[in-house]
């Protein structure tokens, strides 16, 4: 069975997007700073050296994506193809007509549990990459998110969009691995059930 993993770069004060996060400025002001560990200067993804490179490789071994509607709409559903894997979008409403041009994108309107089950089935023996603050929060609440990999960036944003703004209750975590690099502290947790 596949595992679901939230991979997220985050400021020390918990922000995954800076102020002014909107469609014309996805990720908000300062967003590139959160991803410099693998995309220097906000440019193309570059495999880092050492242990960060190993994490980068792991991060790209997903077999399906579960992403929130806001996330996929800001990036135009990655043009309908994110490395050839299926993209599942839990949503309370059906997609707009342009999504019909993206056969790998599936909107799931019968709940986060169904969306995750479909994503895990599509992922096979690889993991499901989870994208989006709200979607990750709902997956935690429903008990269908298995692991967190947080790339803690040494910066304080002071505002923007937080990853864990609202949680239904306390969530206990097991530390799987901690890797320190000059650009980030990479924290891998398993969710205790």
Residue ranges of predicted features:
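Enzymes that bind and transform nitrogen-containing heteroaromatic metabolites
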Residues: 1-193
């Amino acid at each position: 069975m596949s595992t679901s993993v939230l991979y997220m770069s985050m400021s020390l004060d918990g922000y995954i997007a800076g102020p002014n996060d909107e469609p014309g400025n996805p990720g908000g002001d300062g967003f590139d700073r959160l991803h410099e560990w693998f995309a220097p200067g906000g440019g193309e993804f570059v495999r880092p050296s050492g242990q960060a490179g190993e994490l980068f490789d792991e991060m790209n071994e997903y077999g399906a994506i579960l992403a929130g509607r806001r996330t996929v709409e800001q990036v135009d559903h990655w043009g309908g193809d994110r490395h050839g894997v299926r993209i599942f979008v839990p949503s309370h409403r059906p997609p707009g007509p342009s999504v019909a041009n993206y056969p790998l994108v599936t909107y799931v309107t019968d709940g986060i549990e169904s969306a995750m089950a479909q994503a895990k089935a599509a992922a096979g023996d690889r993991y499901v990459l989870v994208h989006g603050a709200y979607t990750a929060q709902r997956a935690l609440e429903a008990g269908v998110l298995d692991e967190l990999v947080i790339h803690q960036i040494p910066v304080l944003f002071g505002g923007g969009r937080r990853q864990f703004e609202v949680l239904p209750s306390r969530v206990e975590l097991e530390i799987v691995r901690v890797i320190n690099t000059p650009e980030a502290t990479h924290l891998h947790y398993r969710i205790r059930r």
